[in-house]
């Protein structure tokens, strides 16, 4: 987890022996295509089936003040940036002082935002990122460049994460 690595609370090696390993064997073209087709089909179906819930959540977030959606630059495959889409769960201008990791009791999180985060409803718009090809259903979570740079300083192996498409799970 990002916070654990940055805070030094998670060991990435023990006396020079890695505690985390990445096994990145490239997928065959048919495997990549099958995975992409599954991503498209499942994310399209999820967006369609969840559209009533998405509309209700968007309405509630707008009524709380501000836009329903929050876009943030993240690093994807080959460390290319893309805009991740989420329901807004923080007050407007929450990162005006610069990037910060959030915590459960973070005062920047709105009341409705706490509820959305508790049930992971703020993540549902990411099915759009999957549909457009920025993300996959399964893959490592995409990180912001600011924090990825800090992780790379402590765990150079982290660079291997950019060999695969980031995912919702």
What are these regions (language model features)?
Residues 102-165:
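A short, structured surface patch at a secondary-structure boundary
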Residues 1-38:
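Flexible, Lys/Arg-rich cytosolic regulatory linkers and terminal tails that connect or flank
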Residues 1, 164-169:
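Short, intrinsically disordered, charge-balanced linker/junction segments flanking boundaries
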């Amino acid at each position: 987890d990002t916070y654990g690595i940055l805070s030094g609370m998670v060991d990435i090696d023990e006396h020079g022996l890695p505690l985390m390993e990445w096994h990145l064997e490239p997928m065959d073209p048919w495997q990549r295509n099958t995975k992409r087709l599954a991503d498209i089909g499942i994310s399209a179906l999820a967006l369609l089936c969840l559209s009533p819930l998405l509309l209700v959540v968007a309405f509630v977030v707008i009524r709380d003040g501000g836009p329903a959606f929050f876009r943030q630059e993240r690093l994807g495959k080959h460390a290319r940036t893309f805009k991740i889409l989420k329901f807004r769960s923080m007050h407007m201008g929450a990162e005006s002082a610069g990037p910060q990791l959030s915590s459960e009791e973070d005062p920047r999180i709105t009341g409705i935002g706490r509820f959305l985060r508790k049930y992971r409803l703020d993540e549902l718009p990411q099915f759009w990122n999957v549909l457009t090809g920025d993300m996959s259903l399964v893959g490592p979570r995409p990180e912001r460049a600011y924090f990825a740079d800090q992780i790379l300083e402590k765990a150079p192996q982290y660079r291997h994460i950019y060999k695969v498409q980031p995912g919702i799970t």
